[in-house]
Amino acid sequence: MKNNLKETLQTVASGLESAKVTNFPTNWESFNEVNEETFCNQLVDPWGRHGLSCLKNVKGTHARHKKINDMIQVAISVSGTPAETEPRGLDKEDGKQPDGWTLYPWTIGLLLMWDYTCRDTLAASNVLGCSKEAGSAAMAAEDIKRKKYSELAKENHFIPIAQETFGSWGPSGLELLKEIGTRTIIASGNKRARANLFQNISMAMIRGNIINVKSTLPPLNKNQELLFLNSIISPLFDTHYGLESK
C-alpha cells in the first residue's frame, strides 16, 4: 500500500489541485495500532482509507454530495443564470434525475444539466490507474455519467462533474466549473470568485473525507480525538496559508 500511496501522491497533482490545499494527513503514525474491523466487516488499517470508499459508511459522502451541489447551484445563479438542484418536471420514465439544472438556457439555447460524483483515489479499483495518470478515476466516472444520462443529453447541455478524494477533476467538470467561475467574476466583479468556488468545493470534499475516515475508527478518548483532528487540520491550514515548514 505504501508504494501505491507514494506513486499516487506523486502523480495526483493535475489542473487546479493547488486550489484544494493539500489534504492528506501527515501524522498518521499516531494511529499505527488501529487494525480493527468496521461495522461492514472490513479491516481498517492505520491509513484509514477504507472509509473513503465504504458503501455502508456514507455520512460524509451524502453530506459532501449535497453541500457541493448546493455550492454549484449558488455559483451558477450568481453568474446570472437561475438554477436549482433536484430538478422537477423532468420526464423520468427511466428513473434518472441529474443533480441540478438551469431554469434558463446556458449555451446555444440549451439548459445546463449537471451531475456530481466523487470517487476514492485509493479504492482498490482506482489506485493503480490513478498512480499512473492523475484523475483517471474521475475521467472514468464522467464517462459513466454520460452513458447514464445519454437520453437527457439529447435535448439538454449535460455535463458530468467528477472529482476524486485526492482532489483530481475530470476534464469536463473542470472546464464547466472554470466557466461558471469566469461568469461569476463578470457578474459580481469579484476577481477571486473562481478561486473561491474551487477552494470551497475542495474544503467540502476534505470535510467529507474526514467524516468518512473518522467513522471507521474505534472509539477515541478526548486526547486521541484532538490528536486525530490536529493531524488532519494542521496540514490544511499550514499549506493554505503558506506556513508549511521549509
Residue positions per predicted region:
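Non-catalytic C-terminal interaction segments of nucleic acid-processing enzymes
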Residues: 1-43, 59-60, 74, 78, ...
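Short Cys/His-based metal-binding microdomains
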Residues: 37-68
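Two-metal-ion RNase H-like nuclease active-site motif
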Residues: 86-88, 99
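Conserved beta-strand/loop block within the catalytic cores
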Residues: 95-104
